[in-house]
Amino acid sequence: MNKAIKVSLYISFVLIICALSKNIMMLNTSDFGRAIKPLIEDIPAFTYDLPLLYKLKGHIDSIDSYEYISSYSYILYTYVLFISIFTEYLDARVLSLFLKVIYIYSLYAIFTSYIKTERYVTLFTFFILAFLMCSSSTLSMFASFYQEQIVIIFLPFLVYSLTCKNNKSMLLLFFSLLIISTAKNQFILTPLIVYSYYIFFDRHKLIIKSVICVVCLLASIFAISYSKGVVELNKYHATYFGSYLYMKNNGYKMPSYVDDKCVGLDAWGNKFDISFGATPTEVGTECFESHKDETFSNALFLLVSKPSTIFKLPFDDGVMSQYKENYFHVYKKLHVIYGESNILTTITNIKDNIFKNIRFISLLLFFIASIFIRNNKIKASLFVVSLFGISQFYVSFFGEGYRDLSKHLFGMYFSFDLCLYITVVFLIYKIIQRNQDNSDVKH
């Protein structure tokens, strides 16, 4: 295939994806402030009428004014400082376009690490697979200011770095791992996951790899330790809207210090409901104000008292009612993704219909399979991505319980999609390899 034609087709595909997704975005559920507070005035929450064109502050606050330490926030800050030289506005559509271009390239990097795209059939195979990875549930993140979007770009790059064996890949590994692990508290286990792969399956240059993983882990711990503002809410939800509620619903004996009347009520007095997500009450913030002393260790008491919970929790009725890529916030009628409905929205709906209740168990199967696979490329990819996805389930639940679990499980959903993508690419690679071997034998 002529290189100019190949590049033209690739650019055309990227532009089609960007055009289809330009009006698909995410609701601000009061979390945008963590990333944009020093840069622009507060973006209205719970409104579907955002302009996506935001005026920058006349004087951008210093970078140390962030209360929530996140690699995403610092990347956004750097971007805004640069564009402020030329404009007074942050255009979320333009920013999301750049991010989509990088995301598609990360998928292309994984694909070409197995299969060369010198023929039309292989290039269009990539287009089909990449298109399926561009659902509204994924691309809508780029028009928001949620830290989770870091995973969309840097998890594929992390996978690519694991499958290459050169100094450049080691540098890519470091930056990808550092950015993911410091993007949000719930990604803290990522360095340990990568390190466990190296310990058990790939000890080549283990000292360098160990240093990388330790540095990233320490950076993540630092980010968590110096972040402010949301910890008390998370601890309350992890217990009274999480572990205690699970124990109550399953007939387990709760600790004597638990206030039964507050179990199942979030910090604003919304009562958990499987059918509706939640229902309003007149309690308000009374329960939260009375139990600000809760700890994450209290939430983990569930695992200590009932170890079988680690196997049962993913199949809990309350949890399964949250398995939905068309995310909702607390109330099931309050959809997080909004905008133009098109084929990208259809992909999200199809994924929900087919994979709704099997994503977790599928990730577990991917993980088990990775242990026995001989090919080191696919082994590394599936081991790390599946274990990352599994970890996201437990960190999300024990980090904030059932509250907003639908969106908090984004990392698990995307990991499942990426495992499928990698597996299909690998199977196509094996088919091509077998056909080439048969052709060589005939000649």
Curated annotation (Swiss-Prot):
It is found in: Cell membrane. It is a multi-pass membrane protein. Disulfide bonds: none annotated. Its main location: membrane. The keyword Signal does not apply. It comes from Escherichia coli (strain K12). One of its GO terms (cellular component) is plasma membrane. The keyword Cell wall biogenesis/degradation does not apply. This is Uncharacterized protein YfdI. Keywords: Cell membrane, Membrane, Transmembrane, Transmembrane helix. The chain crosses the membrane at residues 7-29, 68-87, 94-111, 121-143, 150-164, 179-201, 206-225, 358-375, 382-399, 409-431.
